From Swiss-Prot:
PROSITE patterns: RIBOSOMAL_S16 (PS00732). Belongs to the bacterial ribosomal protein bS16 family. It comes from the Bacteria. Keywords: Ribonucleoprotein, Ribosomal protein. This is Small ribosomal subunit protein bS16. Gene3D superfamilies: 3.30.1320.10. InterPro entries: Ribosomal_bS16 (IPR000307), Ribosomal_bS16_CS (IPR020592), Ribosomal_bS16_dom_sf (IPR023803). It comes from Campylobacter jejuni subsp. jejuni serotype O:2 (strain ATCC 700819 / NCTC 11168). One of its GO terms (molecular function) is structural constituent of ribosome. GO terms for biological process: translation.
Length: 75
């Protein structure tokens, strides 16, 4: 199954996350199909950038959103 979830980037204690489309059987930081945005919780205010067009496409072909991505994209 295809999922849209976060993959961790950055360095120790300074993480940021890419919002990626991947197979659900892959590891968290394993290979991904497409990167559709990023999320940086370490700055004030939090920086969220998502390609809405690509997000809508992947949802239309059956990709599931992780809980965190669903809450981020609803903001």
């Amino acid at each position: 199954m295809t999922v849209i979830r976060l993959t961790r980037m950055g360095r120790t204690k300074r993480p940021f996350y890419r919002i990626v489309v991947t197979d659900s059987r892959k590891r968290r930081d394993g290979g991904w199909i497409e990167s559709i945005g990023y999320y940086n919780p370490m700055v004030e205010p939090e920086v969220i950038k998502v390609d809405a067009e690509r997000l809508a496409y992947w949802k239309s072909v059956g990709a599931k959103l992780s809980d965190k991505v669903a809450s981020i994209t609803s903001k």
